Amino acid sequence: YLIYNDKGDIVKVLSIREPYASLIKMKIKTIETRSFKTNYRGELYIHASLSKSNVDDELSKLVMPMYGKIICKCKLVDCVLMTENYVKEIKEKMPMEYKCGLYEAGRYAWILESVEEIDAIEAKGKLGIWNF
């Protein structure tokens, strides 16, 4: 099963655990934190994986989880290596965003913009950015 975008290209997808995938769909989470960088920039679909993250109840109460489905699309516009100053700035200026990720110097902040909800599509997730 493949999804094609408006240009006829196969789409790129990133699997993210709930509640974080739904928080992206709701435009509450705009930065995905990862241990690795990516050179990819462009349209990216978000897949809510089957496994749930261990998070505080405050975040879980905000969403209706949609496990095992592609739930929204966005644009991956940048990938920033986190420094101590970057982490401090996010914690001070964006406290909700800070709660939605693992912010540590040496990790990467994937910057997401232009989020659009889509009709959910069942899919089996994969690691890294994958084609669907």
Feature-to-residue mapping (PLM):
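Glycine- and charge-rich intrinsically disordered segments
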Residues: 1
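Structured alpha/beta reader/binder surfaces that contact nucleic acids or chromatin modification marks
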Residues: 4-132
